Amino acid sequence: MKKRIQVHIPYRMLIERLEDVLSAGLNPEIYTDAATLDSIRPKDLKDTREILAEKGLRITLHGPYMDLSPGASDEKIRLITVERYRQTFEAAQLLLPETIVLHAGYDERRFDGDVPLWLSQSRKTWPRFIKEAEKMGSVIAVENVFEENPLPIKRLVESMNSPNFRVCFDTGHLNLFSKVKMEEWFNELGSKVSEVHLHDNRGKWDEHLIIGDGNIDFP
């Protein structure tokens, strides 16, 4: 079971606490924000991968999300997102993660309920990265954040129709933003889910609490 569990950690923290990660045998889900992508050296990424591989640790990668929108109606914003994802995949080619987590990006309020608009823009963004994931043997997992129900993500994943494009289900985000229960998410997306983010909150803030310290009713 431990081999299938990842621990989310920003890249800079991973480097600072690398000995602790290695001694504890933790499989890292490495978070790379925009500042990290702009400053990191390819050699450092390769060295990190090799050190973790020597200990038999598997890597997953979480790409940037602040200010980004892969389905943005503003084409310039979408293209900025594409550029950040391009950098993410450059890092991925050196880290060779099993999964690359990126936010799906649908928000009922920002898109005024226009799922078709978001979907049409999203379909421009993902195909090139799906091809890169296929070459690396990695899976892109799009994560729920502000989505109120699973249908926008389901439509996106089905439209891409690739085994390398799946879903990352986040329990904390569901507790904050979803209008339907967890069971409905898994009824709609269960076969498409390749990763689950397990954390808790009290229903007001994305606190990332230990399971049991919030109010999520885990099955």
Indicate where each model-derived feature is located:
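A short acidic, helix-capping loop that chelates divalent metal ions and anchors anionic groups
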Residues: 67-72, 108-113, 175-177, 204-209
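N-terminal pre-domain/capping segments
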Residues: 1-87, 93, 151
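Active-site beta-loop-alpha junctions enriched in small/polar residues
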Residues: 8-12, 31-35, 64-66, 105-107, ...
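Acidic/histidine-rich catalytic cores of soluble enzymes
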Residues: 127-215
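Charged helix-capping and loop-helix junction motifs
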Residues: 42-47, 77-86, 115-126, 179-188, ...
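Hydrophobic faces of well-ordered beta-strands that scaffold small-molecule active sites
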Residues: 3-9, 28-30, 59-63, 100-102, ...
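Active-site acidic/histidine proton-transfer and metal-coordination neighborhood
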Residues: 71-166
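Alpha-helix-loop-beta-strand connector modules within alpha/beta enzyme cores
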Residues: 48-66, 121-135, 218-219
